[in-house]
């Protein structure tokens, strides 16, 4: 097909100069050979076509790159908006968490206060229980001491005659009263006035055992 096209181009490119010359020789196949001028023109035409094709191809590539750039530019704002949306969402979540923490903190404070009050109540209850325990132990000790004395009295009564004990007590009282009178008289003889109350306090005696009256400064059953 190229040879046919070249033949047509050769017939079209004949100049008057060429018409005056002898007819070109034909090849064995019956086709007329291409002249040097036609080959040069065909080479230039082919080079121009190749150049235009390269320019068109480059323009196509540039157009595709521009389209991709436009697509990327259209996508970037969307991605930016998505990131902004995500950031806003995270901020909202943080605000919600802060609000929840704010609402929970009074409850937690109330729980802490209730726990502290419960601890104080437990401590007070333990202190009261401890005080009650000490008081009961003291009462038990007093009762045990009273019971011990009653047992001793019962034992003495079972072993001794009460009338004899009463007689001994009366004898001890009268002898003690007499001794105190004699001491008072002895101090008075030396020029020292001493009362019976001072003598009783000096010896550590009890008034009710001696039947002594401090108001009258004398024994009431002498």
Curated annotation (Swiss-Prot):
Main localization, broad class: nucleus
InterPro entries: SFR1 (IPR042429), SFR1/Mei5 (IPR018468)
Listed GO CC annotations: nucleus; Swi5-Sfr1 complex
Molecular-function GO terms, alphabetical: transcription coactivator activity
Coiled-coil residues: 130-155
Polar residues: bias regions: 22-35
A Gene Ontology BP annotation from the UniProt entry: double-strand break repair via homologous recombination
Pfam families: Mei5
Segments of this protein annotated with the region Disordered: 16-36
Protein localization: Nucleus
Annotated keywords: Coiled coil, DNA damage, DNA repair, Nucleus, Transcription, Transcription regulation
UniProt keyword Ribosomal protein, yes or no: no
Family label: Belongs to the SFR1/MEI5 family.
Described purpose of this protein according to its UniProt entry: Component of the SWI5-SFR1 complex, a complex required for double-strand break repair via homologous recombination. May act as a transcriptional modulator for ESR1.
PANTHER family on file: SWI5-DEPENDENT RECOMBINATION DNA REPAIR PROTEIN 1 HOMOLOG
Self-association and partners: Component of the swi5-sfr1 complex.
Protein name: Swi5-dependent recombination DNA repair protein 1 homolog
Origin species: Gallus gallus (Chicken)
């Amino acid at each position: 097909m190229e040879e046919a096209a070249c033949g047509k181009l050769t017939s079209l490119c004949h100049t008057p100069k060429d018409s005056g010359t002898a007819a070109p020789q034909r090849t064995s196949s019956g086709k007329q050979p291409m002249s040097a001028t036609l080959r040069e023109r065909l080479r230039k035409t082919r080079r121009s076509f190749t150049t235009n094709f390269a320019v068109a191809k480059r323009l196509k590539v540039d157009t595709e790159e521009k389209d991709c750039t436009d697509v990327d530019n259209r996508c970037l704002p969307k991605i930016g908006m998505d990131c902004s949306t995500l950031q806003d969402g995270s901020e909202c979540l943080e605000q919600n968490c802060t609000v929840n923490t704010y609402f929970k903190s009074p409850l937690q404070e109330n729980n802490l206060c209730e726990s502290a009050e419960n601890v104080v109540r437990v401590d007070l209850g333990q202190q009261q229980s401890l005080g009650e325990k000490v008081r009961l132990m003291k009462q038990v000790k007093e009762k045990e001491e009273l019971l011990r004395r009653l047992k001793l009295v019962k034992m003495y009564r079972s072993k001794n005659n009460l009338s004899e004990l009463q007689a001994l007590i009366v004898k001890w009282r009268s002898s003690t009263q007499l001794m105190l009178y004699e001491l008072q008289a002895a101090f008075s003889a030396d020029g020292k006035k001493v009362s019976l109350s001072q003598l009783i306090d000096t010896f550590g005696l009890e008034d009710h055992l001696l039947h002594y009256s401090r108001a009258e400064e004398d024994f009431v059953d002498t």
